[in-house]
Regions:
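Catalytic-site signature of metal-activated, phosphate-bearing donor transferases
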Residues: 1-160, 168-172
Length: 173
């Protein structure tokens, strides 16, 4: 990565940002399947032309002309598989459900199941999670569970006034 940055001529570039491939790790294992690689992320940008996007889910850089570099950033996403399943407990699905509710998104009784199943199939089959063995299966199951929980919570906000009243929608993050 350092060598890729050194080779850039930042004073004469038409690009306002540069994206690196994120090499996501679980423990010491590189996860190449389930859409986790190459997972491009902008980490070098001209602050006069690009800026943080106004998105509540994740911090991201809004750039009009980013360039993808042939270099990796190693990202230790989770120390072990257990942390991958602790993620729903950190309430990312609840935050996503709040954002969807604020945007007027609706769910029905089948939404949690269908969205959860769709997320699992997308990760495991279409993004080749089956090629990653246990890690690929685990990532796909985690994606399905997160999607299921997100829509189940959205449905709960729609159906249960006490739950809705107890939530602070001004504080999503």
């Amino acid at each position: 990565m350092v060598e890729a940055i050194r080779q850039l001529d930042l004073s004469a570039t038409e690009h306002d940002a540069f994206a690196f491939r994120r090499r996501n790790m679980i423990g010491s294992r590189w996860i190449r399947v389930c859409g986790w690689y190459p997972d491009y992320c902008i980490r070098l940008y001209n602050r006069h032309h690009a800026r943080f996007a106004d998105v509540k889910q994740h911090a991201s850089i809004g750039a009009s002309n980013p360039k993808r570099l042939n270099a990796d950033i190693v990202h230790y996403s989770f120390a072990n598989l257990g942390q991958l399943f602790a993620k729903p407990g950190r309430n990312f699905s609840g935050r996503a459900a709040k954002i969807m509710f604020q945007k007027g998104k609706r769910a029905n009784a089948f939404s949690p199941f269908t969205h959860g199943l769709n997320a699992f199939i997308r990760k495991y089959i279409f993004q080749r999670g089956f090629m990653g063995g246990v890690d690929g299966m685990t990532v796909a199951i985690s994606a399905g569970l997160n999607s299921y929980l997100k829509y189940a919570k959205l449905l709960e906000y729609q159906r249960d006034p006490k739950v809705l009243e107890a939530e602070d929608f001004k504080k999503v993050w």
